[in-house]
């Protein structure tokens, strides 16, 4: 029955490009949903029917009773291959082409055998297979099951349309075991065939298109690289041009702004295989997708509405049109062309019956899709070839074919002449060359074309040889070579190799020998076709690995048949995919890694590997440590403003050397930024000060970063409506708020620094009140560059002070490509810096042995690792940088910006890293092998992670800043603190003390006969400034404490206690004998005293410090000719020297002469020979001084892990249910047992006749006596007579 005309009108009206809801779902490839939520996505009406009821299932292999027929979803068994390898396929033949929307999988019931990840492939003929790909053109890895019993669904957001579907398991648990179901519906196709001269025209004059949103989707297949697929234009300059150009899909459009926007997607689209196209526009945002590879763009210009009011063409145009870059009409098939939700081909078919045929014009088109007689052949290896027959002993040779390849080398044709010699056509560096050897003639090499033909496009090739002439024709460009030669052809022609191991790898079609063309399907395997499956007939199985471009940051992609390569030379980035920046993150980052000059011009990359490009700046390094970054612009010179009277009539936009996103990144990372702006004026007002907020009408103003007119001048405060002089009260006219507002005929100036980062930089300046060019009014402005100081990236520092402390970041989606940059500072030899895991994948960076960094990861296959060893220590408590990158080709580790190492990915599909755990910084995910030290500047894919914010949350073992245990100087008495961050140790080598904090005394208790001598070895020591220290205690106020002498010069120094109990120093350093007495204290009272003797000022000043008294300085007048140096010191004595009879009696410790500690040396194990006791044997003593101790380090305890309340509640609910059931069962059993025992007790005598007649009469002698003594008695009542 014919539908009403109004409905048809509505259908045609819907052609006016509305929004296709289906396309809006195409954003991220695949949605995984659980079984209980699946009905929320599709209803039965939405194409959601099981498709495998009558499907035929086959597999590459299977175990007994686990064949492919067992792989149906609701079966009790499952398909299991013989071996667990990656090369197994489960193939589903659906009988007819179907639209597949969803797949469901299960494992083997009641076991742990299930598939966790798989690839889906589909085919139109069961021979040529294509993988379902993600938006980056990589095979999509579908998530599988987590156990053997539950169902897991995956939704194909762009449906699969095919008859054959096969599943390739890539990851599994225990064994590969699968049960499968596909959901979808029958596929009804509406086809339209174009032969290269045809087209369809739809008249839009009656119903023009005016839309802000539209969507188009269709399928096509073709064997030709160029052709117009869809075109329309309007009278206002709008046009919409969809076309094939060099086997890529190109969309050019203009919304009337006279600026064309061009998008390109897809590659190798002329392979005569169906391709899915989806285009969706929402105002100026557009999505363009071919075979699920998505390109997003933004239409140039200001307009958002598409106006088309002429014709809409499909398959071609009658003449050249604006926006078209190809001239050929389309050759091939279009299927199910949907404008919004209306099938255009169906409407066109019905239009004649409905009387709407006048709207459509069809030229040389049919409603069908015949297969073209073109059968490509793929040579997959260099050893594969085809051997075809020709006319033997012919005087002419003619061979033609089409070829496409990505290889630079390979033999395409080899023929041995019957008359002797040969012909070889080969590729060398992508150029086609001819190697010709004719009998009795010299061998010649023909190189006639400068072009390279290994670009993946189809190229035509024809070669013909006849007497004295060779004609080579490539892409319709003939080259003739004339040479004396005569050939007789042989019988065999080797195509793509055969005689040479370096065969051709790529595709060929229409191979003709001597004018004869034989269909590839008719070639005889083994006789004409070599190497079995290495030659694929009726398919061109080439992969364009450069589309979409895997090289980041505009790197140039090249490829061969196995892999791609990136040329990063012009990008400023490095690595296999141009991911890692060669430019520093900031000026401070440059200073941290290398020596710098005072001023350096360079490019900064503020986000590292992120999307922002490098931009030029000037770095200024000052002696006080300040680092300033200067960003220039185009208007830094002083500019005169004259002849602009109206407020803001003069406008100057400022163009910086960076775009807005780059500038915002620089501002956000800097500690402070400022920009100087000044205006010099003569009788030209700046503001209209003073003024109220509602009456502020300035003559001039500047524009902020967000295009906001600002109400204050540089140097003032936001909202003040003043200049700097108005804030300070120093304006030329005290009644005004700006100098220029005084309207003086003298030159005045208002200027200052704008320091509010939220408004910087200045986008534009506007000036007025400068009169006419003939009057005296005039102004001059100067805008300086944007200057910034500091980098918050390097002040974002945290300290890990406990080995199992960690910062848990959200899961890091490293995917196919990602990088992590950080700087660390530690003294630890072995630790894990970061770690993250997934179900099978993981990443881990660890420090090993103090001088080697190791990055380990696993992405589906076995674990891989890359190591960087250094010739220096990485645990030297200095900052070191590390950059970790993993991409499609390799993993890369860079240490300190220069030491690099890589590990290549294994051949085959590159799997994305699937990480589900937190990214744990500072330990493993189990909080083991922890890191202690400092970490800063953590960047994930170029984005800074605010570690300080995490530390402010009070995390266990984490501190803000880089604060070690040695910051508080815990080591005393010149001890050297060795940082460990979770603790510390003290090196007392340069101290007269020992102990954990160099606070334990090393002393000796001296008697009158005790003497200790230290002999200076080697060259004699001479000093002009000494640092001498000695501690002592005594109750006998006399004696020699410490002395130095030289027998060579007679010079000496003696420190002793005088008989009066005072400290006395006597010395002679060559200028004259001197004696110093410290009279303020009596030193013989048994107290401990600490004395320092020092010289300075060229030996003319002696400083004597005792205990906590103020130092006393003694100055000596030494002549310029005198020698104040203590020359050739030979001996140091403690207690007395050899010339004395009685020595010091008491305890001496802390003996130090510069860097010599004699008591420490004498009491160490294996003491040196130059220090010894010459008197009685001495033992070490602490002289009654208790060592200083520090409070113990507070012990922290890791808090209990956070528990998901929902999961906990669910777990408790499950446990409660189980416990309740168990308790009920136990109570029921106890009740049964209780009833049983009660019944048994009540019925324990049932069935027995029992009496108590013998009770009490067991020992009776006779029956009468037994009756009398029995308990029951003889039942004769004894009568009693009572008297009342």
From Swiss-Prot:
A Pfam family hit: EGF
Side Cytoplasmic, residues: 1239-1284
Covalent S-S links between cysteines: 47-185, 333-369, 507-540, 546-557, 551-566, 568-578, 934-962, 966-977, 971-986, 988-998, 1147-1183
Subcellular location: Cell membrane; Cell junction, Septate junction
Glycosylation sites: 195, 329, 340, 398, 668, 974, 1047, 1137
Tissue specificity remark: Found in septate junctions of epithelial and glial cells.
Keyword Chloroplast on entry: no
Extracellular topological domain residue ranges: 36-1217
Descriptive protein name: Neurexin-4
Species of the source: Drosophila melanogaster (Fruit fly)
Gene: Nrx-IV
